[in-house]
Amino acid sequence: MPISQKNQNFIDRTFSIIANILLRIIPTTSGEKEAFAYYINGMSAQSEGNYAEALQNYYQAMHLEMDPYDRSYILYNIGIIHTSNGEHSKALEYYCRAIERNPFLPQAFNNMAVICHYRGEQAIQQGDSEIAEAWFDQAAEYWKQARTLTPDNYIEAQNWLTITWRSK
């Protein structure tokens, strides 16, 4: 097993242990604890590439979790899985739902921008420059929002915004 994979497995195991300890000691309702357990199980399955299992756990967590902030991270992770599966429309839907509950998720804005940029590139390959420009404009808006939330991140996005004259 490569060293990076061993390190990731160690980090995942450490996170799971700490999460289980916190789950026992933090005063929360049984529903909140159960939702968190499903969320952790979803993250574990996702990190192992078991996306179907991860989605099942995330959907269970969504059913139990009432806090909008916590729900935003569940929705965000569901979006990541749909992105990984090439289901970009579904991914955009889940990222939007995450942002509705927590507008301070720069990574969701970034992921939405990446999908829009990809769709713009696809439109160019299909010879539809008008549609491509619309997708690129949408990508620019999402990247601007991500950069507003975390100005020191997404440097490549800032470079793209600058060279395409979309930074303002």
From Swiss-Prot:
| Ranges: TPR repeats | 35-68, 72-105, 120-153
- Look up and give the membrane topology term: Peripheral membrane protein
Which of UniProt's keywords are assigned here? Membrane, Photosynthesis, Plastid, Repeat, TPR repeat
* Biological process according to GO: photosynthesis
List the GO cellular component terms. Answer: plastid membrane; thylakoid membrane
Q: Which PROSITE patterns match?
A: TPR, TPR_REGION
Keyword rRNA-binding assigned to the entry: answer is no
Gene3D superfamilies with a match to the protein in the record: Tetratricopeptide repeat domain (1.25.40.10)
Where mainly located? plastid
Q: Which Pfam families match?
A: TPR_12
Keyword Plastid belongs to the record: yes
The subcellular location is: Plastid membrane
For this protein, the record's PANTHER family field holds: CELLULOSE SYNTHASE OPERON PROTEIN C, TPR REPEAT-CONTAINING PROTEIN MJ0263
Family, per the entry? Belongs to the Ycf3 family.
What's the name of the protein? Photosystem I assembly protein Ycf3
Q: Which organism is it from?
A: Cuscuta obtusiflora
Q: Which gene encodes it?
A: ycf3
